[in-house]
Amino acid sequence: MGKRSDAAAPEPNLSRAEDLVLRMLSIPGGSGREGRVAEFIRQQLRRAGAPASSLRMDHSHKRIPQGGEVGNLILSLPGTESGPRRLLVAHIDPVPLCRGARPVVRGRFVVPASKSTALGGDDRAGATAILVAALEILKRGLPHPPLTFVWTVQEELGLLGARHLQIGLLGKPRLAFNFDGASPEDVTIGATGGYRMQVRISGIASHAGVSPERGVSAISIASLAIAQLHTEGWHGAVVKDGRSGTSNVGIIRGGEATNVVTPEVQVHAEARSHDPAFRAQIVGAIEAAFRKAARSVCNVEGACGKVEIRGRLDYEAFKLPEDHPCVLAAEAAVRAVGGEPQRAITSGGLDANWLTAKGVPTVSLGAGASGAHTTGERLNLAQFRQACRIALLLATAAEDK
């Protein structure tokens, strides 16, 4: 849109925004249990004047295999000005480490009161930033183009809310902005692709003291496979022939007693790369290592272990053109609040991966949360305020004023 010379660029009520983010951080509800925070957001929007007809919950949770309390919350507003529809999005589920978190303000930061929990700024801060934009528009009657706001669920389980988002409910947005990350000045225009795997290792149980030779240890199989991946450079940061990616064995479950040769182990792993072909090569190396290990662990009767491997693409890699309209709009908004935009490519997955794959090119900006997924997580209030200002500028198409 062109510049509007008849009105100043809008400024949000930042004191109210800080109060709101503290309330959002205090609401329990991890992945699949977002009902309370979704209802809180809905109530805030209704009290600000959003018509009931403008709010809906999609059925994404019914499409997700493990289910969930609610789907993605969607607010659709017709424009008071002409222009392409804009989408603002953020996820509302924190990681399990945030369970029991209580936010406290210490100086310039919001931190968890306990040293044993994370904070949940990832991504309650982003969810609050776009909520602030919606509330300011509703309460103040600010002019704006057609708008859609989405608060997604189950992002932390592999972008499941965005993956199963009913894209037809968004009103065909042309510009999309995802608030998730640390610095609001980081304009993320691309992200890696990720593949998730589950390996079921079947051995043979036996008494570990009386007849260990009759058993086939599933733990031994897992150990050999992981050791091979580590030794051959296929675990952790993976660099081969100028191509790069990552892999990780993140979950191992199995065993019930020390006097039993373990008959079954479940292993969960992932592989990531911006290069789909190289990511497939990493996946192949992981599969080969587990199959080889299973064949090599046998009992005295010649019976060996077995593996069953299942996997799925979590999200595909993407990179937007640097001159894409949503990239330029995001950078203009950062400059409008006195920042210096920095284009970035991330090795993490974002809701933007699936939105872009579904035909809605999306850039991502931070909302002030750093140290995500750790007990050292904190929310930089200055950056959060900046994110709120940027979100409102983008929602009102005033970033180029």
Question: How should these model regions be labeled?
Answer:
Residues 1-9, 21, 219-401:
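Metal-dependent amide/peptide-bond hydrolase catalytic core
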Residues 2-71, 268, 383:
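N-terminal helical capping/dimerization or prosegment-like subdomains
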Residues 26, 62-63, 111-121, 206-212, ...:
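A short glycine/serine-rich beta->alpha loop
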Residues 44, 61, 65-151, 386:
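Active-site metal-coordination/substrate-binding segment of hydrolases
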Residues 61-63, 92-94, 150-158, 181-183, ...:
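Acidic, glycine-rich active-site loops and adjacent beta-strand->loop/helix elements
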Residues 93-109, 188-201, 332, 363:
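Acidic-glycine-rich active-site phosphate/pyrophosphate-binding loop
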Residues 105-117, 202-206, 337-338, 369-373:
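Glycine/charged-rich beta-loop-alpha catalytic/anionic-binding loops adjacent to active sites
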Residues 115-194, 238-240, 246-249, 258-259, ...:
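Acidic/histidine-rich catalytic neighborhood of metal-dependent amide-processing enzymes
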